[in-house]
Amino acid sequence: MSSSTNLMLKKLLALSLITSIPAACAYPSISEIKNPPEVDVSVNKEKAIKLEVVEKKWTCPTCNYNEKYVLEKLQEKTKISDRNALATIMGNIKSESNFIPNICEGGARVNYNQCHSGGYGLIQWTSIGRYNNLGKFAIKYGYDPSTLEGQTAYMINESVFQRYLPEFEGPGKTVDQYMVAAYYWLGWGIKGYRQHYAYNYTKKMILA
């Protein structure tokens, strides 16, 4: 067989290989690119696994029950999310009552209607108006005004707290800055250790 014949056979063989490439290996046409085939994205609802987004909250593992309860309700019933803001509120409550709801100013542990002078409760409600409103709120919503649950609900819903709530809900401030809003909320006469307590809470609280 001559060399020219061999060369021709090789060319024919190469051509046959090229033309026999499967269509799946070829590039898609313009129409296929513009109109891609539909993809089945249906879901079997019975077998589908629901993904739940768990929102993290500030917790205080070393705090007592009363402290944990108030911290939880502050986040559940408001939009406060800043650790310094929460710690400031907690520090002020600790300074006022040490989270003891049935405490009358001076230290006596009595029911709501047995505290006849000074402040009473978690934040030591002192003025006649604020003290009486605690009782009215409790009656209206079925709480005992001497309890942690009743006083926490009143504290969060009280008009004075609601007035300054936006200051606490605004994030990014220092404890010292949030303390200004706390002063107008509580109107304390003696600052005492409340800011020191607040800083301690910032160290004890964790996001979980």
Describe every region a protein language model picked out.
Residues 76-84:
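Short, charged helix-capping/linker segments at alpha-helix termini
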Residues 4, 38-44, 99-103:
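Poly-acidic low-complexity segments
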Residues 48-69, 97-173:
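Peptidoglycan-targeting cell-wall enzymes and recognition modules
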Residues 84-100:
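Short, functionally critical alpha-helical segments immediately adjacent to catalytic or ligand/cofactor-binding
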